Amino acid sequence: MAKTLTASQAAKEHVLAVSRDFISQPRLIYKTVSGVNGPLVILDDVKFPKFSEIVQLRLADGTLRSGQVLEVSGTKAVVQVFEGTSGIDAKNTLCEFTGDILRTPVSEDMLGRVFNGSGKPIDKGPPILAEDFLDIQGQPINPWSRIYPEEMIQTGISAIDVMNSIARGQKIPIFSAAGLPHNEIAAQICRQAGLVKIPGKSVLDDHEDNFAIVFAAMGVNMETARFFKQDFEENGSMENVCLFLNLANDPTIERIITPRLALTAAEFLAYQCEKHVLVILTDMSSYAEALREVSAAREEVPGRRGFPGYMYTDLATIYERAGRVEGRNGSITQIPILTMPNDDITHPIPDLTGYITEGQIYVDRQLHNRQIYPPVNVLPSLSRLMKSAIGEGMTRKDHSDVSNQLYACYAIGKDVQAMKAVVGEEALTPDDLLYLEFLTKFEKNFISQGNYENRTVFESLDIGWQLLRIFPKEMLKRIPASILAEFYPRDSRH
């Protein structure tokens, strides 16, 4: 039978336990900084330093900074300082080893708040009253207890909903480049995302209380941060949004922990508060460059284009923190945004990201130059989980066939357009001219839509059918006869 203690006995026991632990693991303060290299501080004569241990640094002027032990070699310790190393004086800096890993306070009160890249509130609000302190590396999810994502999220964007459907619990990045409207697309998805409302079928968890957005910005400019903040405030969803902002003028090293803090908050909201969380991470290219900077400071052997050899593993520790877990109603859907340097999809950052994530949404500069919004090029875009999230009972039974046929016609239209540039329009067959007409109308009527235009998946499918009616039935070889008989003769509603 458990022994019951009075309050005073319990307090005494607690003091004994703390002092016992303190004696075996004393929190020593060192003044042995032997060097500073980029974002790293090297300490000598350290007793029992531990890997990933958090170190508190007190500068000569009394400023407090925190860092993490990256490397341990005998009595030497290499500490990465999250707030940067500017102003650190080797003689007068005090370093205290805390004996604990990096944890972040989490609470449902984080919604509606704005934090910096280190997780400290910057919205002039009170500190977070923590319900728990969680390790920012997250809990490993047993693959056996993961649930396959099967509920489609309707984004209201035709090029995504019909051609590259996103399932709840999926991780799908936006591959973009400098100067393209990836922020506007992400904001539109945040505004419009919800479950597909099927007539006659009640969707219980579609109401707003159950939906949250966690937004993490790494190395973005003030304009981008202001754009998202203003957008969330204007559409009234700010009380369901948690923002982590590491701006371009903030320390580079801080970018390493910003996405992990955001995902820890998202995991708490999804698995403890059972909310459906949409995580937007921008810009992953800045994150990878911060990783390269730390790797160079540690003098590690560089990999492709100077990025560290472990970048694939490191990116996976972020992207894999999405999904659904058995026994929990919440989910985490991840939409990382990355800007491809020089529009190069073979660059290591998009290349490795594409291997880990379940598809990608490709934002195209040529479409953007033709004033098409959203400039989503459907041919290199892909959603690997689309097949399980669409069809009868989820969207409509013609969904996958319409999608396949639109893909086929658009691809042939692109080939015809290239051929026309060589041989001229007079040399094209009547069929070729139909494909050219389809190509123009597909980009103008289907891909292109308004910034605030929220099309249901059924409206998008109807627009798809409207375009397919350009062709005679015999040319629509990707659609079964039964589907054609039911949907092809329909009068257009638009």
UniProtKB/Swiss-Prot annotation:
<feature type="binding site">
    <location>
        <position position="384"/>
    </location>
    <ligand>
        <name>ATP</name>
    </ligand>
</feature>
<keyword id="KW-0813">Transport</keyword>
<dbReference type="Pfam" id="PF02874">
    <property type="entry name" value="ATP-synt_ab_N"/>
</dbReference>
<dbReference type="InterPro" id="IPR020003">
    <property type="entry name" value="ATPase_a/bsu_AS"/>
</dbReference>
<dbReference type="InterPro" id="IPR004100">
    <property type="entry name" value="ATPase_F1/V1/A1_a/bsu_N"/>
</dbReference>
<comment type="function">
    <text>Non-catalytic subunit of the V1 complex of vacuolar(H+)-ATPase (V-ATPase), a multisubunit enzyme composed of a peripheral complex (V1) that hydrolyzes ATP and a membrane integral complex (V0) that translocates protons. V-ATPase is responsible for acidifying and maintaining the pH of intracellular compartments and in some cell types, is targeted to the plasma membrane, where it is responsible for acidifying the extracellular environment. Essential for the proper assembly and activity of V-ATPase.</text>
</comment>
<dbReference type="GO" id="GO:0005524">
    <property type="term" value="F:ATP binding"/>
</dbReference>
<dbReference type="InterPro" id="IPR027417">
    <property type="entry name" value="P-loop_NTPase"/>
</dbReference>
<dbReference type="GO" id="GO:0033180">
    <property type="term" value="C:proton-transporting V-type ATPase, V1 domain"/>
</dbReference>
<dbReference type="Pfam" id="PF00006">
    <property type="entry name" value="ATP-synt_ab"/>
</dbReference>
<protein>
    <recommendedName>
        <fullName>V-type proton ATPase subunit B</fullName>
    </recommendedName>
</protein>
<dbReference type="InterPro" id="IPR000194">
    <property type="entry name" value="ATPase_F1/V1/A1_a/bsu_nucl-bd"/>
</dbReference>
<dbReference type="GO" id="GO:0046034">
    <property type="term" value="P:ATP metabolic process"/>
</dbReference>
<dbReference type="InterPro" id="IPR005723">
    <property type="entry name" value="ATPase_V1-cplx_bsu"/>
</dbReference>
<dbReference type="Pfam" id="PF22919">
    <property type="entry name" value="ATP-synt_VA_C"/>
</dbReference>
<comment type="subunit">
    <text>V-ATPase is a heteromultimeric enzyme made up of two complexes: the ATP-hydrolytic V1 complex and the proton translocation V0 complex. The V1 complex consists of three catalytic AB heterodimers that form a heterohexamer, three peripheral stalks each consisting of EG heterodimers, one central rotor including subunits D and F, and the regulatory subunits C and H. The proton translocation complex V0 consists of the proton transport subunit a, a ring of proteolipid subunits c9c'', rotary subunit d, subunits e and f, and the accessory subunits VhaAC45 and ATP6AP2.</text>
</comment>
<dbReference type="InterPro" id="IPR055190">
    <property type="entry name" value="ATP-synt_VA_C"/>
</dbReference>
<keyword id="KW-0547">Nucleotide-binding</keyword>
<keyword id="KW-0375">Hydrogen ion transport</keyword>
<dbReference type="GO" id="GO:0007035">
    <property type="term" value="P:vacuolar acidification"/>
</dbReference>
<dbReference type="InterPro" id="IPR022879">
    <property type="entry name" value="V-ATPase_su_B/beta"/>
</dbReference>
<keyword id="KW-0067">ATP-binding</keyword>
<dbReference type="GO" id="GO:0046961">
    <property type="term" value="F:proton-transporting ATPase activity, rotational mechanism"/>
</dbReference>
<keyword id="KW-0406">Ion transport</keyword>
<comment type="similarity">
    <text>Belongs to the ATPase alpha/beta chains family.</text>
</comment>
